[in-house]
Amino acid sequence: MIYGTGVDIVEIARFEKFLQQGNDALFDRIFTPSEIEYCSSKKHSAQHYALRFAAKESFLKALGTGLRDGISWKDMEVVNDQLGKPELKLYRRAEELFRQAGLGACFLSLSHDAGCAVAMVVLER
């Protein structure tokens, strides 16, 4: 049974601007070291950062908590499986709330076009 859905859309230009400004503190606050390493290694790194940010926002919307109840940005991490499919790994408080809600599955879809990055998360019991 579906527990919640979340969708978020982000302008990639916002992350291009953050990169140009050298706003490392912002990236360190939102993204895990693995996410930073992955995104920084890509030709269009702003696009990859925007997608990961949208994924985290989408998860928070699907869970219904937003960024409160002790959840931090780094409690969620976007990773790719062997075939490149994005998945959301949960840690600490995000994982705890996921389990408390009796959830068993988290589905993530990412896409980008026309300067925007979009993510959708479906949480299932």
Swiss-Prot record:
Membrane-spanning parts: none
Matching SUPFAM superfamilies: 4'-phosphopantetheinyl transferase
Compartments where located: Cytoplasm
EC number in record: 2.7.8.7
Pfam families in alphabetical order: ACPS (PF01648)
Broad class of the protein's primary localization: cytoplasm
Gene3D superfamilies xrefs: 4'-phosphopantetheinyl transferase domain (3.90.470.20)
GO cellular component labels: cytoplasm
Domain of life: Bacteria
Reaction(s) catalysed by this chain's protein: apo-[ACP] + CoA = holo-[ACP] + adenosine 3',5'-bisphosphate + H(+)
GO biological process: fatty acid biosynthetic process
Chain sites annotated for binding Mg(2+): 8, 57
Designated name of the protein: Holo-[acyl-carrier-protein] synthase
Organism whose genome encodes this protein: Geobacter sp. (strain M21)
Recorded name of the encoding gene: acpS
